[in-house]
Amino acid sequence: MAKKKKSPSTPTRSLIPILTVLFVISLSLFAYVKWATTNKAKLNPQKTQENLVQVVKPINLPKPSLSSRTSVESAMQSRRTARNFTETALTMKLVGQMLWAGQGVTADWGGRTAPSAKSAYPLTLYLVANKIDGLDSGLYKYIPGEHQILHQLVLVKSGDLKAITGDSVGQNAAKEAPAVIFITGDMEKMAKAFDDKRNDNNVYLEAGHAAQNMYLQAESLGLGMVTMAGFNGEKVKEV
């Protein structure tokens, strides 16, 4: 595992962009609320059915650690934004720990690491794997579980996505990062928790909760991280 480098001195759909998060050194994360892309599936039902067979096969992640030598106070004190990467591949343990920090299930009733208004939990994390030991390149959905802890990945799209991920935010760092995480939010799910009244601000707030959790987790793991809110929505949909 690479060591952390010292840093120099009105939405129209239920799913919309929120935030971009990058993990640097040996991990990068993107946080988004992503647009739905169901129209593509309708164009080729047969191909969609074939993809579903691939999607439903879960990959179990290593059990997350519940303690470390770094206190919360120490992580907050030393947390800094970083923008440089090493070429070292990530491990499944590191990636799983970061995903768990963002949206891991911590209670049998579905409670997660990040709080949610009325326990709606509208966020979903997606991982773009570029250089992770034991994991093929592609886009994966994180499955934390609902009323039981699952902590799994499911393949959504295979292949090298470095270029398109980098283009979506206009930064080369995204192309070089071993891993990218999208934070997505379901606005309709949150609205249902409020008697079908839109409450998008809570989704944005929760994306911030998840991002901060990952910031502190990255610090504890000796990884760097940067959050970014600027991205090209149309290119994000292509991922």
Model-derived features with residue positions:
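Short, charged, solvent-exposed linker or helix-capping segments at domain edges/interfaces
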Residues: 137, 192-193
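N-terminal Lys/Arg-rich, disordered targeting/topogenic segments
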Residues: 1-13
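N-terminal amphipathic, basic helical "cap/leader" segment at the start of enzyme domains
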Residues: 15-177
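Intrinsic low-complexity, intrinsically disordered segments enriched in polar/basic residues
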Residues: 3-6, 60, 201
